[in-house]
Amino acid sequence: VVRPALAAGKVVLSDRYFDSSVAYQGAARELDVDQVREISLWAVDNLLPDLTILLDLSAEQAIHRRNKTGVEPDRLEQEKVDFFERAREQYLKLAVEPRFLIVDANLSVDQIQAQVRARVAELIR
């Protein structure tokens, strides 16, 4: 689905990708991060995104926001705070790559949108 769309010159947006596997299945579950990364890269045939947007928020703040939704948490969302801290730490390690845009998720929606739009505009010009 992704490769044909890219070949046709289309923009492809995805909510999560292999970086999520590295952060959650690797670091957060305390598995071998390098091994999870290699398997994940194999699964996506080494197709890396041009841009990965990381909405950064502390684990405590994320859990607090999640609990305010009134929706029952899924299996992953029921994990303890240290699980999410490990995932966040891994995301921040991954985010040293230039394809990442780290956005402070404490900002207003308008501020977040402005940062994302500016970075996306650089890519599609």
Each predicted region: which residue ranges?
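A glycine- and Lys/Arg-enriched "phosphate-lid" helix/loop adjacent to the NTP-binding pocket
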Residues: 20-89
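NTP-dependent small-molecule kinase module
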Residues: 60-125
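Walker B catalytic acidic pair
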Residues: 16
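N-terminal phosphate/diphosphate-binding loop that engages ATP/GTP or pyrophosphate donors
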Residues: 1-5
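Loop/turn-to-beta-strand initiation segments
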Residues: 8-11
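Hydrophobic/aromatic beta-strand patches that form the interior of the parallel beta-sheet core
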Residues: 13, 51-53, 101-103
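Conserved beta-strand edge residues that scaffold enzyme active sites
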Residues: 19-20, 109
